[in-house]
Amino acid sequence: MRNILLKIYDSKFLNQEESYQLFTLISSGKITDIKLASILTAMKIRGESIEEITGAIKAFLDKMKYFPKPDYIFSDIVGTGGDAKNTINISTMSAFVAATCGLKIIKHCNQRISSKSGSSDILEKFNINLNASPEKSRKTLDQLNICFLFAPKYHDGFKYSNNVRTDLKTKTIFNFLGPFLNPATPPLSVIGVYNKNLINIAVNILKNLQYKRAIVLHSDNTDEVTLHGTTYVSELLNKKIISYQLQPESFGLKMHPKKILKINSLEENYHIIKEIMKGKGSKLYEELIAVNVAMLLKVFGYENLKENTKLALNKIRSGDVYKHIRNVANMLKEDNHARHNT
């Protein structure tokens, strides 16, 4: 351990195994707060390497609680957050639309970081029980194509660093781990990053973690596809990485003028999303969700982005997505009821 610390303090990079050892200790509560603060600060100042981040991810994955992973193909869709845009929860709603289209989605979700409402906050507004048992979550996935795994329920190891991270009041390596810590370890994923410079880092981490196919994207300082400019993409397929750019026309849509789509509260976010999922939302919001669903369909092998977008728009405008959300909530509510009666 001493050699690992000396390397960090000398601004030298750890290899993947050294990082794994370090974060295994951190996730076990065996590093003091003052030492942890110095480690995180030193790593942040010199920048964290792909190998260091991969080692940290593997350490936390090895300590997570069990989830009954399915044999069939499934995906996650997640954003890093941290863009401070306070927009609606695009990835969460895209997951529901994708499930309504027939895709299997296991969404890893957490509490808000920099937005007015994180994925868990909005899910609770829709009465989605985030404390469902792993078995019930798996059953919901089998029958309704989607389930949500709440990070604090599956990852105990983060509790040992919470106080230090709060006190530091700055982004650290921890802020980048979430999208890679899905307890179901999916073979597919779509990840949005808040900074264009993070695309290459994220896609190479996915390669290190042996994802079958994945997309990392960024557009206009947000962690999602936008409709007023260029979306930058790196795609992992068969251990090879390709990079390309997309425009709204790539999805068969027209360019929208740039608009501020900020929401001011959880209640406002919920109301906007509810109307969209009922098929009564604004055209801009419908299309914004649809293009992100199109990318999710792509990792499942549906290569035509224009057709993918049409399919997603049809599902959104039909109102079927809201019915699907209600069905998921009702199924998980049964589990909640059973727990209260045991």
UniProtKB/Swiss-Prot annotation:
Cofactor: Mg(2+)
Residues the entry annotates as binding Mg(2+) 2: D223, E224
Superkingdom field: Bacteria
InterPro entries: Anthranilate_Pribosyl_Tfrase, Glycosyl_Trfase_fam3, Glycosyl_Trfase_fam3_N_dom, Glycosyl_Trfase_fam3_N_dom_sf, Nuc_phospho_transferase
Binding-site positions, 5-phospho-alpha-D-ribose 1-diphosphate: 79, 82-83, 87, 89-92, 107-115, 119
Keywords assigned: Amino-acid biosynthesis, Aromatic amino acid biosynthesis, Glycosyltransferase, Magnesium, Metal-binding, Transferase, Tryptophan biosynthesis
Naturally occurring in which organism (per UniProt): Buchnera aphidicola subsp. Acyrthosiphon pisum (strain Tuc7)
Cofactor: binding comment: Binds 2 magnesium ions per monomer.
Binding site for Mg(2+) 1: S91, E224
Pathway the protein acts in: Amino-acid biosynthesis; L-tryptophan biosynthesis; L-tryptophan from chorismate: step 2/5
GO cellular component: cytosol
Subunit-structure text: Homodimer.
Name of the protein: Anthranilate phosphoribosyltransferase
EC numbers on record: 2.4.2.18
Family: Belongs to the anthranilate phosphoribosyltransferase family.
GO biological-process terms attached to the record: L-tryptophan biosynthetic process
Functional note: Catalyzes the transfer of the phosphoribosyl group of 5-phosphorylribose-1-pyrophosphate (PRPP) to anthranilate to yield N-(5'-phosphoribosyl)-anthranilate (PRA).
Amino-acid positions noted as binding anthranilate 2 in the UniProt annotation, renumbered to this chain: R165
Endpoints of the signal sequence: none
One Pfam entry name: Glycos_trans_3N
A single MF term (Gene Ontology): magnesium ion binding
